Amino acid sequence: CEPFTCGNDEDMDEFFRTDAIAYAKFRMGKSYCFRLTQNPKKIVACFTVSNDSIRLYDLGSSKKNKMWKDFSNREKRLSRYPGILIGRLAVAKEFAGQGFGSEVVRFIKEWFVVEDNKSGCRLAIVDAKNDVKVLAFYERNGFSYLFQTERDEFRYINLSKSEQALFAQNSPRSTRLMYCDLL
């Protein structure tokens, strides 16, 4: 394939250029790409998925109750709800702003709700870059914040020492946890 660049995120470009292979080798995530039919060497978009879950018992009562409203009593006893994590998603620079990102998200959601899917999952999960455009993109595609505030989100995750320092300074997180119910 021709070299891929999303043009605005060197970390993302580097991931798909070099790290995606190691992620697959160590079963940390699986990357896929969409290519042009008329030119299969031209990559339109790339994404990486892996299994994940959300610990519902760690959530506040209002969020937990909202997520549980459609679950049966038997399901409520689960401490974790399985999901598919969209770990990375990027559209090639020349195709940006044309709806391809939304098409990829729609594809991923549909891929995991068909009867012959390989992984049971109730949720699509993303740890989205804490950027206004990125967060708005996921909201437009049906995702909601797992936590209303970053402070609540800091409490949910296991903080590294650097994140603990940010939390103490009330600094923003670099990412925000979001989810979409696939039912």
Placement of each model-derived feature along the sequence:
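Non-catalytic substrate-recognition and accessory regions of acyl/acetyltransferase enzymes
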Residues: 1-98, 102, 106-125, 129, ...
